[in-house]
């Protein structure tokens, strides 16, 4: 009987109650707020990291571009322009022949300008590009006012390349230098040169002045050499020489045989 009693006592003994920890009213809300703050902080950090990575990639790309040689940059730009032209060809398949030629001329002109900017980056091409278009220069016939020519519209007076400027020179110089013997030509030439170079930078004007000084020195040497030659020729022409017309012979006559007697002096 004793063991059964012990069993009953063990069964009747209940475990001690667990005292539950009392929660404060704001404890759950603080946990939620902390989780929100942590989420916001992590989002800000991710944005900062993304911006930093983007800035780093951009800086690396710029550094890589700067390391490229000028020739590489030119080739890349040419390739880009060719790709753009090919894209335009595919988009403008319906254009006529005249439009296609005009587009190709414009593309070639833009490519030449870009090439010049790449090769001569220190030259202010924007200043030349932004210069106002030339005014109309109309020359009319005095006897027939209806006969007029706008020189500014002629392709000759719209040079853009070295060969085109050379053509302007070879066209105008023969027309102008034919007047060089006229009294007003020298004064006109001085004013003409000033007007030609007044819009150029001082460095270019200095180079032009130096070339004129060199030309002046060469002309002075030529003139001095010519003066010396003329003086020698003139001296040779004006040299006095004794010219005798009588034959050179020995006089054998005696002065005593002159046919006069002593009494003739009396």
Swiss-Prot record:
Ranges in a coiled coil: 40-82
Record lineage: Eukaryota, Fungi, Dikarya, Ascomycota, Pezizomycotina
GO cellular component, one term: eukaryotic 43S preinitiation complex
GO biological process: formation of cytoplasmic translation initiation complex
Keywords: Coiled coil, Cytoplasm, Initiation factor, Protein biosynthesis
Composition skew (Acidic residues), residue ranges: 26-44, 86-97, 254-266
Protein name from the UniProt record: Eukaryotic translation initiation factor 3 subunit J
Functional description taken from the UniProt entry: Component of the eukaryotic translation initiation factor 3 (eIF-3) complex, which is involved in protein synthesis of a specialized repertoire of mRNAs and, together with other initiation factors, stimulates binding of mRNA and methionyl-tRNAi to the 40S ribosome. The eIF-3 complex specifically targets and initiates translation of a subset of mRNAs involved in cell proliferation.
């Amino acid at each position: 009987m004793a063991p059964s009693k012990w069993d009953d006592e063990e069964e009747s003994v209940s475990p001690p109650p667990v005292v539950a920890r009392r929660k404060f009213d704001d404890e759950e809300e603080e946990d939620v707020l902390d989780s929100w703050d942590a989420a916001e902080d992590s989002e800000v950090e991710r944005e900062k990291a993304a911006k930093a990575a983007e800035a780093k990639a951009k800086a690396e790309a710029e550094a890589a571009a700067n390391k490229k040689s000028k020739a590489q940059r030119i080739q890349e730009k040419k390739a880009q322009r060719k790709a753009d032209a090919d894209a335009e060809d595919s988009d403008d398949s319906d254009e006529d022949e005249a439009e296609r030629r005009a587009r190709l001329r414009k593309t070639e002109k833009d490519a030449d300008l870009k090439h010049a900017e790449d090769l001569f980056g220190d030259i202010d091409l924007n200043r030349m590009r932004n210069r106002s278009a030339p005014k109309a220069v109309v020359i009319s016939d005095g006897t027939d006012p209806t006969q007029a020519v706008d020189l500014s519209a002629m392709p000759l007076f719209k040079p853009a390349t070295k060969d085109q400027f050379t053509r302007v020179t070879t066209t105008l110089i023969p027309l102008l230098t034919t007047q060089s013997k006229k009294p007003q030509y020298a004064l006109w030439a001085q004013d003409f040169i000033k007007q030609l170079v007044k819009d150029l930078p001082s460095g270019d004007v200095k180079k032009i002045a130096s070339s004129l000084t060199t030309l002046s020195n060469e002309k002075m040497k030529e003139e001095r050499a010519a003066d010396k030659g003329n003086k020698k020729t003139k001296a040779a022409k004006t040299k006095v020489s004794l010219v005798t017309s009588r034959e050179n012979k020995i006089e054998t006559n005696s002065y005593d045989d002159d046919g006069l007697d002593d009494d003739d002096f009396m």
